[in-house]
């Protein structure tokens, strides 16, 4: 699939440095550049996700990692921290009625989806280590409602429920239902 071209060069030379780039991006993140940083991170993550779905079978990559021997970069603590920071920055800008509301809503949904995927992959990679798995599971359980509830506030209940469904997290889904019903009563 990769051949001798620029794709192979990228995967051999640049990809090993992705975590360093993400760490540097996180260090530079502030309110003035959050939208641009989010665009960059989402382009990278969505491109990688598309590549995995299109070519994963060729490289015998499972859709979700299942062994601790291979922890994908997108499931690293560095990537998860950056996704959460971008999510918080985007949510904050939405709360302050930023001029680019439509883009921010789209970004918030995409960041929630990518963060949930990263948490899921992180949890799957720790199955052989009970202590690490318990920590990853607890972090994921804590993050799910924090990533999904804000989607209700921006009128994206459809995305919140769609993202919650695959995780079989009944508690969060009930919270979403109750919060959504409460918002409807307020109207």
What are these regions (language model features)?
Residues 1-187:
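Extended alpha-helical solenoid scaffolds
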């Amino acid at each position: 699939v990769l051949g001798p071209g620029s794709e192979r060069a990228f995967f051999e030379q640049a990809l090993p440095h992705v975590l360093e780039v993400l760490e540097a991006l996180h260090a530079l993140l502030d309110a003035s550049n959050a939208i641009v940083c989010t665009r960059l991170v989402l382009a990278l993550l969505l491109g990688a996700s598309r590549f995995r779905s299109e070519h994963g079978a060729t490289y015998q990559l499972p859709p979700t990692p299942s062994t601790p021997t291979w922890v994908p970069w997108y499931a690293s603590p560095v990537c998860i921290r950056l996704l959460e920071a971008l999510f918080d920055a985007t949510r904050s800008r939405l709360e302050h009625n930023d001029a680019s509301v439509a883009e921010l809503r789209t970004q918030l949904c995409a960041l929630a989806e990518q963060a949930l995927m990263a948490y899921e992959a992180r949890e799957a990679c720790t199955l052989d280590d009970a202590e690490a798995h318990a920590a990853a599971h607890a972090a994921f359980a804590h993050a799910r409602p924090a990533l999904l509830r804000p989607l209700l506030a921006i009128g994206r209940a459809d995305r919140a429920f769609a993202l919650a469904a695959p995780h079989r997290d009944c508690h969060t889904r009930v919270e979403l239902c109750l919060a959504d019903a409460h918002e409807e009563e307020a109207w």
